[in-house]
Each structure stands twice: as structure tokens, then as C-alpha cells.
């Protein structure tokens, strides 16, 4: 155990234009305003947002990297139908990395690190009071990044940051219909508590429970959207089947 602080300083994040483009397109996709059967152009989107084409293209390229859209030469871009297996695949990778990172954080965290984690939780709680979902999940992202940084693996931290971004882009929020901000917040408390007491197995177990809960909810949401004709038992069976196929080895 060390007392050296390794959690990055906490600071509000300003969204780049490319990120704003990503969020705008994501919101339009999830609202049904952008559909897979329609072609769109960078020029039209640039005009709509009132910004130059360069940041629009940057944001769209990141969405293409995440599998949200695809560019076709001389046609523009279109929305890609989400694949439930993509969601399960992302979470299988997260499950292979994040519990181990939480366990390492419990070993390495010093008093200053734990204080920063508590501060991030306080920011999340304040966002709940305001019912500010966007800010809540920004602090949530920072908390997960802080935990990954305590794991002393820069490569894992970078991979996880990319996967969490892909998760937010590929799926809609689970909060609106399936769980509250308070429930999401409560899943983080045992993770930080275990790190504060340097209980590595408990930290890993709490992180596994949190990531699994989120992954299964997002998978169910994705399947429900693709197959509205399925009843609840059929949906649960399909979720179990896909989840088991992707995570049984972990």
C-alpha cells in the first residue's frame, strides 16, 4: 500500500465540438430521428449545427469507430443497426478488466486517493439532487477512470475509457425506464467502501456486480427494441443465453 496519490485531479470537463457532435447524433438516433434506412451528409449536419465540417467529421469518425454509423463513398453516412452481441462483447471485456482494476485499486489507494473517490461520489450525489442525468454520468465516467488509474495499468485504463465511451454511444441510458440514478449511485458505494478498507476481493466483487447489472440491462434494452414481440420470459431467456455465451469464461 502506498500513500502516493495517483487519482487524477478532479475538474469540470468542457465538451469538445467533436464530442458535442457525437452526443447530438447519438440523441437523434435514440429518439428515432435518425434511422438506419436513411442517408445523411456531413454538410447537412454541419449546417444544422452551425459549425464547420472538420469537427463534424471528427465526431462522426469516432461514431464510426464505435460501430454506430458507417460512411459509404459518395453516399454519406447512415446509422448501423445495433447488434446485441456487440453490447455483450463490450461488457465481457469490461468484466475481464474492471474487477481486477478495482482489486488493484484497493491495494494501492492512499488516503488522498480515497478522498478523491469520495469527492467524485459527492458530485454524483449532487447531480442526483438536481436530477441532472448528463452531469451524473460524466462524474460516473470520471469515477471509473479514477479507479482504473489506481490499478497502475495505463493500457487497461485507455481500453476501458474507450469501451465506456462505446457503451454510452451504442446504447440508450438505462435510467429512464429501468433504474434510477439513486440505484446506479448505490452500486458504486460498495466499490469505494471496499477500496477504502483495502479489501481487494470485495472491491472486485462489487465492481463485477455493478458492471454485470449494467451490461445485462443494456443487453435487455437492446433486445427489447429489436424484438418488441417477445414477452418477458422470452426476453429473459435470450438475455441469459447471450450473456452466458460472452461471459461464461470470466
Locations of regions flagged by a protein language model:
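Short linear motifs at protein or domain termini
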Residues: 1-107, 220-250
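Mobile beta-alpha loop/short-helix "lid" or hinge segments that flank ligand
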Residues: 65-70, 163-165, 179-182
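Short alpha-helical transmembrane interface motifs in multi-pass membrane proteins
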Residues: 83-84, 170-174
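Conserved amphipathic alpha-helical segments that form helical-bundle/coiled-coil interaction surfaces
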Residues: 90, 111-172, 185-194, 202-213
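Short helix-capping/hinge motifs at transmembrane helix termini and TM-loop junctions
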Residues: 106-107, 152, 176-177
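C-terminal regulatory/effector modules of DNA-binding transcriptional regulators
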Residues: 180-250
